[in-house]
Structure formats: C-alpha cells, structure tokens
Amino acid sequence: MRRALALGLGCWLGCWGCGAEPSPAVELLHRADDGAAQLEDQLLIPYRARHPGLRVVQRNAALSQPEYRRLLLTATARDTLPDVFQLDDVDVPALADRGGALDLVPYLSRAGVDLARYNQEVLAIFRRGAALYGLPRGYAPLMVAYNRDLLDRAAIPYPTDDWTWDEFQRMAQLLTRDRDGDGRIDQWGAAFDRRPSVWVAWIWAGGGDVLCPGGRRASGCLDAAATVAAIRWYGGWVTRWAIAPRPHDPTASGVEIARLFTAGRIAFMTVGHDAVRALRSQVAAGGLRVGFAPIPHRAGVPPATLLYATGYAVPAGGLRRKAGVELAADLTDSLPDAARGGAGIELPAVAAAAQEVAAADTTGWEAAFLRAAGHGRSGWGARVGQWREVEAELASLMDRVTVGGADPARAVRATARELDRLLGATR
C-alpha cells in the first residue's frame, strides 16, 4: 500500500507544473495519515475564505520519514516540488543546503510573520546563518512512556522530572519478572530500541555524543570515555541485566515495542510525540494507564534529550512564492498549531500555543513533554547532510555490541574511524 501511495505521489509530483500553463491552484504536500490530513484540510478553511479566487490542493503522504525524504529529493531533482511542502528537521540539510528550499526572510514582513512567536530552539533548526528555510510547525522531545499499572502493582513511585540512570535501572530490574512461573521472563522493565534516532538521546543524557561539535568528525567524541560508558550501559539492558527483550526484526522494532507496551509486558519505552494519539485511544478504552517522564540522566550530568521538528517550506524555484509563503505562514500560526497540539500530533512551535495546549490537557502529558523540551536540542540529522549514512553505521555499531558481543570500546573506535572517513575528516 505504501509503495503504491509513493508511486502515485511520485507521478503527481513528476507531472506537477509540466503543462504549458501553470496550474491556478496552490499545491500543499505534507506527511500525514488520513486523520491528520483531515485536520489539515480544516485548518485550510480560513486561508481559503480569505482567498476566494485561489484553489488550494492538499496532498498527504502517509509514508515513513525515509520514504517521504526520497519523495522530496526526487521532486527536487526534477524541479517539481509543490508550492508548500512539509520540511522535517532531518531534511533541512538536503533541501536548504542544496538550494531546494526558498530563503523566506525577504518575504516575512509582507506575510506578517513575527519570528518571535516561535520557540527559538525549534526556529534555529530551520536557519542557516541569516537565512530561514522553513517556518516551524511543531516539535517534540523524546520521552519515556511508562505503564502506571505495572508501577502501581510493584509499589514503585512514578519517575520524577529529574530521575537518574540508577533510579531507572533499579525500577526496570524490579519490574522484570516471570509472571506465569514457567522460568522465562514475560514482563520487562524496559524496551531496548536499536535505532540511533532513539538511543542517541540516552547517550546525550549520559554525557556522551556520537559526533563532535560541528558534526565533521566522530573521533574524540564517539570514542570518548563518557560515550563508551553510555553505550556499554545502554547495551547492558539486554546483554547484562536482561531488563529488556532482545530485538529480533530491526525493521519492525518500534511496532513490536508498542505492541508489548500496550499489552502490559513492558514498563518503560522511549517515544516521541507520535505515540500520544495511539496511547490516547488505548487509555480512553480503559485498558491502559500511562504517564510520561523525561529521559533519565546519569548522576552528575545535566538532563538532555533530542528535539524533532517539522515545518513548512517553499521551493526556491517555485512559481507562486508569495502565495506559498502566505500559506506556510498561515498554517504555522498559533490557531493551527494549537489545533494540532490539541489533537496530539505535536507540540506547537508557537510558544504561547504550546503553553495553552499544555494547560488545557487534563492528562498532564503535554505539560510533561513541554517541560522535557526545555532540556532538548536538535539532532545531528538536522545539521549533517550525511546523517543517513552515519545513522546506518551507528545502528551497526549497536548491533555488534548487543548481538555480536563486541567490546564497546573497541567497537566505537572502529566506527569512529569509519565515520571520520565518511564525513571527510580523514582521507
């Protein structure tokens, strides 16, 4: 189904703008499932009312982030990007640094955009020097979701905003059990996720990092003592303490983790804001009680987490730049942002709207995400053009440590050398 959808969208992008006369419609492309697309269509109503003679065509792509990225890069190469398109943080280097996205700064005053309204940490993701290549729409930090019922049964207090690795490990060990007495563990304290997009946040919270400042080399940072210790500790969830089930199919790790969590077989899992909508439905059905806490940090190390962001951008070679910028500005204002936040899609990038969403949320989830975001920073994917290749090497590193039994110190030294070569630090 996804392949057919991608092919269909690819054909649309390939044909868009290829006629003798430009289409009178303003085209919008974003990555969303049907529910989010329906909301986005409602958010277009005020814009359409103010521009009665202008038709707006919305296309949503229910694709994974890598699939959506390929779609954008193909459209960029063919010069067929639509008038406004969703720009994820990890696509900023490819679309902005290579000239695919328009610098919006010269158009902002005419569109009535006040950049002070946005969360400045999130806004910086779309900046390159004085240029701005996207208006931020929403963002989210990585968090830990926990099953309140499992903690209550074990008489374990819920984690605080300042909990540490030691507290996390103690709780996870207490929550790892053989519930049916058959000699095999069937309830785990934590979920081990092999994806670097998830575990890098844990390395940061341990005082380490996978790349050095500037993102041009790994040696001196990936192989630093703090990073090695953090990788050893994170991998130890499965290799030493057995507080997490061993990963099997890496391509389905997120789906399997979510299934085990909702079945009450995992107490803690690392999630982004995309988990909120699914968990809301589970909680509403009465089968699950959930809380959220920040990524725990190593004692003596400041809290840290990853921020992921989305925005709307306009193609540099677009024929309707003015209309595109106006539409992007409209869709990233406080009211649309608050609507997405209220629907559980993401935290609003407009700071005031984020506060309003958190205050209105009776579960306390949004407030927890907002507090954790105060310790967040953008991931390397928003800054390093070769991140996909770097990410693949890091995933292989974690597999060698957890599945292959490699010594973390030796494994990271080899990976650091390979990343230096990949990033051009060595020849």
Q: Predicted regions: what is each one?
A:
Residues V105-Y118, D161, D180-A190, G208-A230, ...:
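Short, solvent-exposed loop/beta-turn-alpha elements that line the ligand-binding surface or hinge
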Residues G129-R137, L142, E167-G220, A226, ...:
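Extracytoplasmic/periplasmic solute-binding protein
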Residues D89-P141, A293:
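Hinge/lid segment of periplasmic solute-binding proteins
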Residues A4, C15-A94, A111-A116, P250, ...:
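Conserved N-terminal structural module of periplasmic/extracytoplasmic solute-binding proteins
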